């Protein structure tokens, strides 16, 4: 009798626990509503403008600075990520990995296409009820280096499948750029999509005008945007891309956002790239943070754009970086094994004393497209000496070839300014 009582009690406890788990694991409905002059995203019946970032690092800081959403490229660690996002009060645009033509997938292979759809169905059913889920993202830049338009039929079939399995969340696909051809394909062959997502860098300010010119009058979001891309700016005579300083990046992040995302009523929000750090051409090009977790001036800008308030402690500002009294765009050639002066001008808005960290790297040769993983070059030790408040001495490598010197200006409060200058070591240089 006593044993039966305990068994009933345990069963009741499990039932209550399961009910509580279900209460905390219910989907929050999200939908897009058309308005007279555009569109608005509604989450749980309330307007929701996406103030997001791409990446899963430093999400606590994103919340602290006014962000409300993160974006992923696949469902790796999705359960942990969604649960953590829910605890922090942020949402997730969940990427579904879809194979690309440029990596060898054949969209004429109907069996492989069907197999991929059914694999994605499992993922959708697994995560559709998590309250932090905001939007499903089908693939990433499927139009990059592609030739087969059948990919759009596959995208549409995936979108229809998602709507069948999950009526509570909108579906999009992420486009590299915003070409008229792709817009036409999507309007005619991807009618199950609820919105499109564009990924642009230097041309962000032109997005509203270009979308209109290319025939898109529906809702959209910007799922990647950031500095001038390595393919968009200047380069040296030896094809090394010229990177903006962190201060130059901060200026263009703000101006381009305010000219497009902030004012276009068809835009539902955005995900800045990248809320973290990665090696892509250089270790500093796209990440808003350094490898040590230090925050650049761009993070200050994002806090201002998200909530209208600048942080109390601002990042250092860097200007006028010179190597051998030349700018990065001057095609700097150095002789091997010689000493050269590097100078910079840096200021701190809070008047804090600044220090510097230096690094010399060979120019990266592991160059990929579409954000594919790249390896970081190994630093060359003992190359920078005589460090002062305004510069240092670079001892050029003995081996001929392309290199890049990096400068990190630190304020002691986890804020940083970054800059780099490419140069080429050549025996007969003057």
Q: Predicted regions: what is each one?
A:
Residues 396-399:
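Residue-level recognition of secondary-structure-to-loop junctions
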Residues 27, 32-36, 40-193, 205-206, ...:
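Active-site mouth of glycoside hydrolases
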Residues 1-23:
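Bacterial Sec-dependent N-terminal signal peptides
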Residues 35, 43, 47-52, 212-389, ...:
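Substrate-binding clefts and catalytic carboxylate motifs of secreted carbohydrate-active enzymes
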